[in-house]
Amino acid sequence: CRWQGYHLHILGYGFTPTPELAALAHRSRELLLQMSVDLIEKMAPEYPQLDPAEYRDYRYDALQGGWAGLHYLWEKGVTRSLSDGMPLYARYGLDYTAYPFPRAEEIIAAIQRAEGVPVLAHPHNYFGKLELAALFGIYNELCAAGLGGIETYYPTHSKTFAAQTALFCEKKGLLITSGSDDHGLFAHTGGWEQYRIGSLMMEPHRLR
């Protein structure tokens, strides 16, 4: 979802499925799928082995993780691995900021109406370069919008970042969660080995 120039991932914990949430999920998924359609169309003039019409009917083994666009580029020899395809979206001007994903406030409110807790996923991915005061300022703004928790423990989070975020959550009474972001087999190769369920280092006593 979109928030002040950032593209955030917000999780819903303990919610009751509702038509509103289903509609938001469907809308977001359609935009994600369209990103790959647009990428193949943009790359096709440079790579004759790519066929936009063929791609629209393309199917892949979901057990391998990733998504159709990554698999198609890999099978066609454009990339050497599934993860090699990920930077291409931004390179061709087709990253998340180019699409009208829902606003963070809209997602947070919908999760709350579904009696769930909105949790910010992997904050270091967006805010890792900020000074502590600026980071806590953003956390406070999101809390004012209704955020109820933060994914504190994550593969890219340093011990310092995780401890700082956990401290903020404890002071605010927010959920403290942990996640590996395991997306299947494609994330278990190259430099992605740490993205495995159960491999994450954390402080269990702080989870809440």
Regions from the PLM with identified roles:
Residues 197-208:
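Extended, intrinsically disordered, low-complexity segments
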Residues 45-108:
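Hydrophobic, aromatic-enriched interface-forming segments
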Residues 44, 105-115, 119, 166-170:
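Surface-exposed amphipathic alpha-helices with a cationic face
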Residues 119-120, 151:
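Conserved beta-strand positions in the central sheet of alpha/beta enzyme cores
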Residues 131-140, 167:
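Charged helix-capping and loop-helix junction motifs
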Residues 125-130, 156-158:
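Short, small-residue-enriched loops and turns at beta-alpha junctions
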Residues 112, 140-143:
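Non-catalytic positions within long, well-ordered alpha-helices that form the structural scaffold/packing
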Residues 1-65, 145, 150-199:
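A metal-dependent hydrolase metal-coordination microenvironment
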